[in-house]
Amino acid sequence: MKTLFMMLGVLAMVSGLRAQAEPAAATTGTMLAAPKVPTAAEALAAWQDFRADPLTRLDKTQPFLDFIRDSGQVHIVLNNSLLAWMYQPMDNTYKATLYAAFLGGNMAAQLAAQHRTDSDDVAGMESALDAYAAVRKAHPDFQLPLFESLAKARREHRLAEAVKNIDSDATPPP
């Protein structure tokens, strides 16, 4: 349950940061239609836009986050041990950037497999590590021990093994 609330909270945070970056939309007195779920192609295009410069492109995340949440075409399981960094105090922009990268990479890997599979935590962390490098480049003092450890594992071509070890250490939520 804690993981679900964390995911909803971060999605709200990403949406809020995105809304701050966009001008307010004009409103009318008519009823609004239910939002359309983005297609896989729209979600992947948004993912690529975000991925090009993740720290400054949070405004591009909504289509792929909506697709993940509403399409039913991907399934992402949030692992408390792998995402423990989410509970550490840090700038909300960094947290949203890393989390969106994790979700987007996971989504893209599942769509590339052309079928709904289990969560692809390795692809998610690979993308989160790319975003982490972008954050660190802009803010060299920012550091997360788990990401440093996983970056080292990636350099040594052991990322899949390291992620699997973290995944297997996870304890199920109460």
Where do the protein language model's features map onto the residues?
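Sec/Tat signal peptide C-region and signal peptidase I cleavage site
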Residues: 15-19
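Immediate post-signal-peptide N-terminus of mature secreted/exported proteins
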Residues: 20-66
